[in-house]
Amino acid sequence: MDIERGIRVAVDTGKVILGSNKAIQAIKLGNGELAIMAENTPKNVKADIEAYSKLSEMPVYTFEGSSVELGSICGKPFTVSVLIIQEPGDSNILEIKE
């Protein structure tokens, strides 16, 4: 499966949350099916995401690229360190959590 294409389709057709602060809130509340982090996510944010995702039993995928690349894949003119897939839409992105 092409991860980049899956992310883009999920952003375009599904429901996603972009940004580390909103992502952490969503994970705490259990709002989402999959968390995706950029490889260069700051250590403190990465630690928070991993800790809260264990508590809420949400799988976390580390994207093998920078936050600049992740932002570009999402079609955004800014960096994206973390995104939460709430609804995948037409994407098969949730297959990576298996």
Swiss-Prot record:
GO molecular-function terms, A-Z: RNA binding; structural constituent of ribosome
Pfam families according to UniProt: Ribosomal_L7Ae (PF01248)
GO CC annotations on file: cytosolic large ribosomal subunit
Keyword Ribonucleoprotein attached: yes
UniProt-listed PROSITE patterns: RIBOSOMAL_L30E_2
Record carries keyword Ribosomal protein: yes
Domain of life: Archaea
GO biological process: translation
Keyword vocabulary terms for this entry: Ribonucleoprotein, Ribosomal protein
Similarity-based family: Belongs to the eukaryotic ribosomal protein eL30 family.
HAMAP family with a match to the protein in the record: Ribosomal_eL30
NCBIfam families, A to Z: PRK01018.1
Protein name: Large ribosomal subunit protein eL30
Organism of this sequence: Methanosphaera stadtmanae (strain ATCC 43021 / DSM 3091 / JCM 11832 / MCB-3)
